[in-house]
Amino acid sequence: MKTRAPAAIPLLLLVLSYTMSGSAQNGKQQHIADLAYQAEMAHEGGECADALTLVDRNECLNDMRIETYKNYTKFFDALREALIQASPNDSNALALDGTELVWEKYRVTACDAMVRVYDMGTIKHPGPSGPSAQTRCLIQLTRSRMRDLKQLYEPTL
């Protein structure tokens, strides 16, 4: 009997550590998604308030767009990984991937259509930095997508 007890303890510890590591992984993805979401939402409303010139504002907005895309990618990747961990196969993650392709096309098309409204002028043609109206649109739609995914996939996140 005494020889079985010491052998059972390492086996029990192995099972417990495996179970806990799975929980930690799930929590890790949720944490990564939450950090990216919070970082992005903290920027909302105060974009480029210190920019004094049109060139400065456009450069700032482009930097903000890049930061927004980075936060979105972290958020999306963590959501995707959480879906994989929460299901027996990759079908939920693959379904999310399909919606992402459609959404990315929508984002570009919607912002291209919106910027056509500003036929002329600095809001559409601010110079070599790129159109600020389009950049603002891309930022706004990306943040909106993050909010939608967070709400829709709340049980996973």
Question: At which residue positions do the language-model features occur?
Answer:
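N-terminal alpha-helical modules
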Residues: S23-L157
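N-terminal signal peptide c-region/cleavage motif recognized by signal peptidases
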Residues: T19-S21
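Bacterial N-terminal signal peptides that target proteins for export
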Residues: M1-P10
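Gram-negative bacterial Sec-dependent N-terminal signal peptides
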Residues: I9-S17
